[in-house]
């Protein structure tokens, strides 16, 4: 309260009236007060107090509508006097507030009781209507306007008059104000016990049941008021409109009221209900509760007491959901159950004078309320804040959801969980209206945070059908109350719990398909030990494991090259024809492999090889008397291990060449292992039988230790003794090869698409990338599209091993193919496909996979690798190289040999390697990376040489692999810093000491061993312990300075910065010598 102003609620408390009553008084006096917190001027207070007092005394009530008449009927004449005394206050209350709800009239009826405690029985009957126990169903008496037509009233039979009402225990009743139809107590006993004051005991029903709740329990603002006939005798209504006395007894219920704190009126219990009727009523309540929990919509036939309300009775139209957000129902008390509603539309709100009221204020009687008028507002005048002051002194209504609206006094909810239309309560179907508890929007945001939202209309009993949607705005009548579910928040689920994955899938894409947050997938990956980010790709195996964690399956939908490359069916036996055998010649270097092949081919391949050793793998087609044979010649040098392994993989038979005078060597053992790993049969050719020191028995013995036992020794390995020089035993060798091939039954289908392997590949300056391909099945023709490794192309030309151009190549035919996009890797599979598009797509798919593998191999610095480094590891030197070779297989061999040279002191780093001539880009790359260019069987052009000189790039050329390896070793050693080593010179014994001014102590010495030089380092030893290490400052023999003193001579010696020289000390001379470091 301010200095000269008073709030409405404070004045109401002071006068002992409700804010609603005070608000009506203020409006009648034309004093503006919209809410309970509005202030009143000090000068208006006296007039207001007089007006309120006048209304209390009954004068103010006569100013209201005189058309509403309150009549009571008693069956026995003993109550005639009580009815006469109570009639005046009733008429006054209804005259002043013609359509006031029951709690308001009850409150006004309380006021005379405050002034006059000894009230007549009728006035006490009003108090009993507020305070009788809820478990005692007593029906209210209904008033109406005489000018409105009276609908058919449902009759409620009273208890037999002969039954006296038992006395109720004295219990204090709580009165809470709530707008409800008028309700007065019907006396059910002929002997009212006026002399025994008692307070009604509030009894909550065991189970609030919808079936037992009259429809009158809907909040007053939206329910139309029924009128009774204007006669002196008003029949009581029956809940089911069938006149059943028992049902009427069961459906009558009393409501608890909150007593004004100022007065505790005493009431008198007229009658108690029949216990059997109460038990039946509770059973009906439980049945209705189960029906409501089942979610069923309340059919029209289940409408409890109160009767059917035609749709035309409720003016104002259907109020959409959300108009009453957060608002409390003024009056606070539970509405009385089961009373008749006086005829005519009952508007929402508090006092309704005849004059129209503005929006948000008091509504004109019976007038329609515009939609949105009551949103969260305070009824009596203007919008009030949520949880604002509730008239009649009620306690704040607890928050929470309630089915069909929250009922503070323990009253049962509406049947079926439906809300009171327009009243404060839940949304249809028992869902809370957004913002109804003041927290709706905020809590919804919290629930929806971080989740996908799917809006859907639920079908079924509570859902809204398509017809409802097409119908548009719904009416306000009984059939207009359709349940509309709000937007439900739930994770978006895939229609089919499958995700489609190509070869790999990003974490973000996977999360999108599964309807999850990427963080959830990353959590699972962390649990699997995979450190992933949202943009990281997962292979199909990892994706399958992760999807399984969430109950999803993985479906591979990407491009699969197997559909085009893998044969769909086996070759029929009738389509197979005999093919020539593929024979690989293997053995140690210089054991005569190529010479043997030359003798068979009657050619001279060896003469053209650098250093007389084979450094390429060659494929040759030879026609012999025994048939056609394809030979593969492999290098024997240790650097060509991969090349030998590749030859063993694509061959049918291995001929192991061993020199008779040299025996089994290292590469011989390696060749045996490669052949066994490939599962290829081995035939041994003991070469160089023409030499004097030839010992074939030694070879047979050594090979038997490797598991190759000769047939003469009881084994199954074929041995042939040959001489490439004299051609001895060659025919026998070819015959044995033919027999072995016949045993193997080598066949192939020449009518299918060609398939083979690349034996060797190179880059020719004029013809571009070339590859030697050994066709293993099918027929390769000029113009065919093919895919090989990460490259695709079309066969432009083919050449045989003699350099002749051919149009087609059948099974077991080696050809040189022109038409590649790049230099392929030796050993790659060569496959002919239908067209160029398929070939390019397969090549692109392989290129992507190869790039992913290379990126995955890149080593990243981790804590383990960082700590595992040695302290001096950072000082290790690196030799950068750019390798260029004539063919791909040789490049592979050189790269492997050079990598093996790396040591802890010097690392070899191959910046780039390729087949073909040295180009300008190679020079620029070497200049940028400070590298040396190694050329093997390649030469640069004059222009490339000029650029190399300008960029100061060193280019080295080699044609023999072991020379290349030796020079790289020397270069690595030259990068190391020289090592200093101490060299002992001699010793001298101190025999005398001399002290020379300004010079110091001079030692007179005798050279006992070696010599002492002027620039040498010295150590002074005393009793075998080093006392001083330093240099000689002066060395003299007699008075002459000398450079050195030999053994047996005497000399004078001065030491640098040291004078503590004693007789008997030994001076040892030494010098430091630098030596080249080794790897």
UniProtKB/Swiss-Prot annotation:
**Sequence segments annotated as region (Disordered):** 52-488
Q: Where is this region: G1?
A: 587-594
Indicate, by first and last residue, each region the UniProt record lists as having compositional bias (Basic residues). Answer: 473-482
Q: Which UniProt keywords apply?
A: Cytoplasm, GTP-binding, Initiation factor, Nucleotide-binding, Protein biosynthesis
As for subcellular location, the record says:
Cytoplasm
Stretches of Low complexity bias are at: 150-184, 276-291, 348-370, 380-398
What are the boundaries of the region G4? 687-690
| Sample GO molecular function, one term | translation initiation factor activity
Region of interest: G5: 723-725
What does the UniProt record say this protein does?
One of the essential components for the initiation of protein synthesis. Protects formylmethionyl-tRNA from spontaneous hydrolysis and promotes its binding to the 30S ribosomal subunits. Also involved in the hydrolysis of GTP during the formation of the 70S ribosomal complex.
Which PANTHER family does the entry link to?
TR-TYPE G DOMAIN-CONTAINING PROTEIN (PTHR43381:SF5), TRANSLATION INITIATION FACTOR IF-2-RELATED (PTHR43381)
Q: What is the protein's given name?
A: Translation initiation factor IF-2
Organism name: Nitratidesulfovibrio vulgaris (strain ATCC 29579 / DSM 644 / CCUG 34227 / NCIMB 8303 / VKM B-1760 / Hildenborough) (Desulfovibrio vulgaris)
- The coding gene here is infB
């Amino acid at each position: 309260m301010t200095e000269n102003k008073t709030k409405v609620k404070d004045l109401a408390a002071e006068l002992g009236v409700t804010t609603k009553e005070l608000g009506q008084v203020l409006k009648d006096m034309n004093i503006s007060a919209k809410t309970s917190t509005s202030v009143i001027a000090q000068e208006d207070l006296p007039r207001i107090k007089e007006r309120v007092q006048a209304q209390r005394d009954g004068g103010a009530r006569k100013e209201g509508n005189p058309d509403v008449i309150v009549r009571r009927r008693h069956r026995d004449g003993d109550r005639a006097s009580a009815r006469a005394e109570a009639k005046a206050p009733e008429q006054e209350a209804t005259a002043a507030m013609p359509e006031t709800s029951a709690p308001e009239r009850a409150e006004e009826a309380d006021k005379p009781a405050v002034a006059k405690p000894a009230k007549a029985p009728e006035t006490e009957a009003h108090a009993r209507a507020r305070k009788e126990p809820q478990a005692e169903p007593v029906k209210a008496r209904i008033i109406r306007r005489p000018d409105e037509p009276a609908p058919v009233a449902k009759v409620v039979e009273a208890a037999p008059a002969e039954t006296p009402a038992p006395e109720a225990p004295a219990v204090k009743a709580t009165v809470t104000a709530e707008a409800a139809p008028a309700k007065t107590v019907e006396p059910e006993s002929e002997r009212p016990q006026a002399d025994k004051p008692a307070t009604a005991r509030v009894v909550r029903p065991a189970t609030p049941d919808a079936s037992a709740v009259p429809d009158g329990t809907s909040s007053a603002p939206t329910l139309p008021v029924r009128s009774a006939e204007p006669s002196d005798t008003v029949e009581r209504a029956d809940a089911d409109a069938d006149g059943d006395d028992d049902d009427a007894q069961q459906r009558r219920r009393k409501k608890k009221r909150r007593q004004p704190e100022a007065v505790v009126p005493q009431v008198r219990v007229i009658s108690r209900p029949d216990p059997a009727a109460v038990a039946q009523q509770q059973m009906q309540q439980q049945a209705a509760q189960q029906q409501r929990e089942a979610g069923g919509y309340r059919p029209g036939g289940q409408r409890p007491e109160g009767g059917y309300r035609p749709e035309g009775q409720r003016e104002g139209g259907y109020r959409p959901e959300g108009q009453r957000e957060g608002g409390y129902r003024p009056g606070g008390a539970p509405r009385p159950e089961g009373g008749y509603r006086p005829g005519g539309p009952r508007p929402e709100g508090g006092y309704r004078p005849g004059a129209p009221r503005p929006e948000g204020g008091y509504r004109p009687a019976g007038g329609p309320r515009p939609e949105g008028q009551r949103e969260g507002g305070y009824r009596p005048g203007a919008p009030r804040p949520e949880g604002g002051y509730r008239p009649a002194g009620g306690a704040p209504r607890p928050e929470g959801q309630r089915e069909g609206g929250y009922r503070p006094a323990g009253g049962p909810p509406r049947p079926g969980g439906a809300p009171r239309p327009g009243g404060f309560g839940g949304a249809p179907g028992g869902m809370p209206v957004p913002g109804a508890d003041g927290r709706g929007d905020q809590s919804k945001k919290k629930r929806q945070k971080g989740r996908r939202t799917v809006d859907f209309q639920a079908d079924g009993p509570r859902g809204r059908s398509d017809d409802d949607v097409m119908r548009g705005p719904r009416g306000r009548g009984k059939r207009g109350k359709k349940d509309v579910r709000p937007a439900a928040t739930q994770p978006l689920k895939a229609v089919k719990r499958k995700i489609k994955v190509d070869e790999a899938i990003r974490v973000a894409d996977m999360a999108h398909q599964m309807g999850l947050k990427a963080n959830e997938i990353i959590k699972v990956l962390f649990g699997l030990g995979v450190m992933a980010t949202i943009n990281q790709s997962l292979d199909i195996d990892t994706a399958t494991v992760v999807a399984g964690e969430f109950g999803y399956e993985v479906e591979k939908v990407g491009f699969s090259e197997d559909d085009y490359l893998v044969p769909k069916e086996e070759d029929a036996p009738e389509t197979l024809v005999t093919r020539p055998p593929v024979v690989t010649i293997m053995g140690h270097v210089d054991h005569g492999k190529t010479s043997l092949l030359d003798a068979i081919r009657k050619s001279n391949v060896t003469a053209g090889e650098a250093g007389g050793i084979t450094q390429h793998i060659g494929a040759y087609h030879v026609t012999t008397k025994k048939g056609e044979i394809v030979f593969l010649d492999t290098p024997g040098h240790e650097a060509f291990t991969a090349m030998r392994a590749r030859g063993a993989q694509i061959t049918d038979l291995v001929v192991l060449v061993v020199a008779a005078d040299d025996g089994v060597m290292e590469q011989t053992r390696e060749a045996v292992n490669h052949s066994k790993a490939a599962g290829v049969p081995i035939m041994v050719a003991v070469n160089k039988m023409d030499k004097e020191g030839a010992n074939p028995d030694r070879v047979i013995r050594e090979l038997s230790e490797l598991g190759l036992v000769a047939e003469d020794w009881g084994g199954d390995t074929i041995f042939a003794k040959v001489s490439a020089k004299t051609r001895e035993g060659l025919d026998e060798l070819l015959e044995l090869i033919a027999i072995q091939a016949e045993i193997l039954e080598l066949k192939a289908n020449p009518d299918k698409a060609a398939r083979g392997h690349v034996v060797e590949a190179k880059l020719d300056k004029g013809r571009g990338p070339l590859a030697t391909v050994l066709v293993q099945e099918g027929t390769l023709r000029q113009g065919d599209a093919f895919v090989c490794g990460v490259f695709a192309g079309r066969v432009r030309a083919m050449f045989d091993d003699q350099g002749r151009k051919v149009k087609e190549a059948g099974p077991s035919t080696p050809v040189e193919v022109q038409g590649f996009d790049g230099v392929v890797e030796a050993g790659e599979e060569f496959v002919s496909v239908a067209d160029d598009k398929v070939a390019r797509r397969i090549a692109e798919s392989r290129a992507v996979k190869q790039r992913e593998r290379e990126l995955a191999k890149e080593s990243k610095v981790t804590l383990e690798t960082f700590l595992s480094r040695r302290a001096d590891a950072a000082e290790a030197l690196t030799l950068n190289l750019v390798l260029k070779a004539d063919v791909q297989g040789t490049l592979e061999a050189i790269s492997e040999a050079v990598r093996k040279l790396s040591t802890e002191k010097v690392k070899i780093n191959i910046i780039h390697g390729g087949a073909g001539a040295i180009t300008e880009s190679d020079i620029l790359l070497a200049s940028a990376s400070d590298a040396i260019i190694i050329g093997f069987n390649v030469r640069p052009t004059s222009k490339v040489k000029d650029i190399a000189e300008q960029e100061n790039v060193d280019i080295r050329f080699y044609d023999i692999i072991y020379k290349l390896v030796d020079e790289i070793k020397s270069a690595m050693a030259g990068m190391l810093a020289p090592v200093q080593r101490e060299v002992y010179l001699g010793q001298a014994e101190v025999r005398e000491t001399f002290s020379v001014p300004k010079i110091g102590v001079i030692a007179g010495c005798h050279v006992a061993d070696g010599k002492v030089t002027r620039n040498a380092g010295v150590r002074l030893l005393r009793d075998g312990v080093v006392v001083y290490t330093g240099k000689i400052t002066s060395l003299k023999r007699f008075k002459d300075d000398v450079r050195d003193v030999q053994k047996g001579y005497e000399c004078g010696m001065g030491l640098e910065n040291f004078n503590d020289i004693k007789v008997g000390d030994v001076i040892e001379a030494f010098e430091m010598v630098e030596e080249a470091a080794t790897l």
